[in-house]
């Protein structure tokens, strides 16, 4: 490992060769000299690839991963590496060369050191949860690192995506990834900063990355490593990339991350020495264009690297708060130099996420990317690929970032404001897309976008930070998830997606890995798997899936895809399990429809991988990403949860839209870009709706994933398994799949396309990956074509969003995708189908709201009387009470108990009604009130009253008289007693002698008088009362005369008779 520590500046790994990046020289020695590091790392150069692989899967890296103390800032042993990074001043601005044209030209990403820093978290603050609007993204600029990344639009969108270039790593893809990674790295690096240099070696980086992530120290230089080119666009950009990759302070890196493509900035993240890696990219760029298109970072070779790095890295990342970063870094480190850088990301991915979390987190994703990148770089060829994916992921640095939502942080890019992804993405996106290609993961693109989101990221990373901790890889995933949500749409899930993305990228072959990444958000685990990466990757994906699910429904789906190969079954399961949680997210994902969403994470992964291999893939990637972003918000991360929550589906919708944009597969990259663009363009930026974005992703992913798979497939398979063990169980299946897939690539591919459309499919694709790029493209195109249309349709259904997206996918998937995929798709789609029927989602919700409001009003009017309320309650009470009293029984002692029914208390209020009618208690006009006129009763009427004769008899008077008589009698009795007493007490002779006796006598006398008086008065009253009856006879005569005859019917008469 020590070699890792300081990669030998001397020779960059082959991949790196082209751009050895000054890495060693310019970047921090440790980080940057990717080549050297890489070599040292394991075999560095030549060996590197294998080594990486080893590392990833089972080699040192993984252990490293395991080892990485989550907490430790210092990168593992590698830590030393970090110091080297040191050199880059935090403030150093990084310029990203023109990323893809798409990217906004000259998007400067300036990140304040702070932003960049691990503090990323703080960055997040900007908008912790909500996706940051583009402006917000800007905020990210806060990134500590002063890094400024300028993106040149100029970069052509070449699918090649210079991303790789960016990576600078040889591993183009790697680079891209790198960038992504870088971004992540930034953060990672930051972590790294902690004193020790990162080791490029898996170890270093990872550690460093973690350290960087930790952000703890900006010191590390972050290499911007911008992937400047966004990745797609200009392959040429790579150079830019290099530029970027200048070691920027780690913090800056973060910033970089911000940059969109350059976002690669992630590179900044790269911050790590990786920079050098990036350099490689440049060379790569060209390649990138080619197959690299994926650019990617593709760096196929890297794929191996990927495997290597990532895993280890992830752990590291986990360790650092940056965690994500660390791990990422760690992993990266493992990878080649370049790779390492990338790797960093990769590992970083998870880590990055974490690290990045703050910043790039996304990078973390990148991590995946990174991994890829790194890997790539390492093995430029293969390795890179792996990385690449991530790369593009990274590439989207942002992407990666995205993944991690951390990246989000980075997102600083702000650019993205756009929907989740932020238009930025547009440019970025294109990048992304291309990235995607290189990234391989669709996500990447999206991711990239995400990256932008990343700004959001700041927030994002917050989340993910936390997540990280759990485990390197898992962290990321989890982290992501959280982040994702918080992050903008893009991150969205995905973060998970992103993460996954990266992962995938990294995984490349493993597209899965990406997936994992996605999960990363969720699981991150996958990421970790990165290490497995490649192979593991596959597994990772699965795990990602598992993870993702949480974040994204898609993810859940993805798994299936992954599963597709052999895993399929397992994967799906995982998915499902996971999925559920995410469900809401998922739905959005579904929305994404494109599977994208689902795929989001997954897809990306897949794509990324493929992408690495093909451009087309890239497109997919994009879609995926979008979906992710869309989804994320839905997930609830949305800044304005209450508002948005209501219609989470919408998010999905956004995704959908994106999908449409994508053009034919071949154009995948382009398409992706377009989509991305649209996404970013869409006003919805902050909104959760990233619909557009999603779509894009979808398509490409398919291809990509295939490719990646193939890449990894052979190499990684074995390795993969180990990772899987590491990962959540779900991951394992993936791994397996990865291993077997190589041979099946073609078949897998075919499935994949379908799958891609369906989010789940994407996953699948990844698994299958092994197919050659060409195949990929074909499949992709096939998928794409149909998918897109589907998607469009979906779009309309936004409201249904969630469900719908799914449905869209299914169609495609079914035919193309493997059965398991189809299943997944179906699952996803089903809901959509159900949903579809409705109007657009927006309207529907309104409708519901409307109904609700009216209902409430009605309820209030009708029910709200106190009366009713009380009755309702009383009824309940009564019911309870009725039950409670037992039937009557006699106890042992013979006492009889009878149940008593509680009766409501008698109140004047019982019949009081107080309805909510304003006029109820008020008279509005004088005419409302009339004085009641008393009628003088006519004799006839009186005579006809009921009981008149009885009254005339005076029975009441007699009754009263009798009672008065009783009173008189009582008084008379008292009077007699008093008289007797008085006579007994007072002897006539001594009457006056005793005062006491005298007083008693007086009192008795007084009472006697009172009694007489009362008796007299009562009698008087009684007499006068009875006088009323004196006229009785006369009255009765009149009554009988007038009353009776008149109204008696014949029947009554007969009865009387």
Curated annotation (Swiss-Prot):
- Region: Disordered; residue ranges are 1-68, 289-314, 556-594, 624-692, 827-880
Biased region (Basic and acidic residues) positions are: 41-54
UniProt KW keywords: Nucleus, Repressor, Transcription, Transcription regulation
What are the Polar residues biased-composition ranges?
289-301, 671-682
**Which GO CC terms are listed, alphabetically?**
Sin3-type complex
State the Pfam families in the record. SAP130_C
Name its cellular compartments.
Answer: Nucleus
**What GO biological process terms does the UniProt entry carry, in alphabetical order?**
negative regulation of transcription by RNA polymerase II
Task: Output compositional bias ranges, type Low complexity.
Answer: 579-590, 624-642
**Superkingdom of the source?**
Eukaryota
**What role does this protein play?**
Acts as a transcriptional repressor. May function in the assembly and/or enzymatic activity of the mSin3A corepressor complex or in mediating interactions between the complex and other regulatory complexes.
UniProt subunit comment = Component of a mSin3A corepressor complex that contains SIN3A, SAP130, SUDS3/SAP45, ARID4B/SAP180, HDAC1 and HDAC2.
Protein family membership: Belongs to the SAP130 family.
Domain remarks in the Swiss-Prot or TrEMBL record: The N-terminus may interact with a transcriptional coactivator. The C-terminus may interact with HDAC-dependent and HDAC-independent corepressors.
- Full protein name: Histone deacetylase complex subunit SAP130
